[in-house]
Amino acid sequence: MTATTRPLRSVLYIPGSKPRALDKARGLACDAVIFDLEDAVSPEEKVAARETLAEALATGGYGARMRVVRINGLDTEWGVNDARAAAAMKPDAILLPKVGSPADLEALTEIVGDIPLWAMMETPGAMLNAAAIA
């Protein structure tokens, strides 16, 4: 942990496609909110969810809560556009699912610049690469 990193006691996932949930998240007692554009959003809602989330984050009101945007994998039809949109939202971090190697994070960094990244390692192969990914 760096001097600027604080431990997170509670992190809540909120679907990026649900305006009511995005509004409710402004008052939740948690340290961080992960705004999910991946698993919590059906394929037919993904583009609209990206726009809904952008509006919610532009409106603000999340206080000191860490704001993390979970995008779709870069190997999906939504991933690259999610990454570009997430970078424009200026979150505290972007969460990339299904990271298998450092190359996945390097590809995302090419798109989002210096925004901090969170890596979800979800496969045995990723676990074997954990030291390199970290």
Residue map of PLM features:
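Conserved alpha/beta-domain cores
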Residues: 2-134
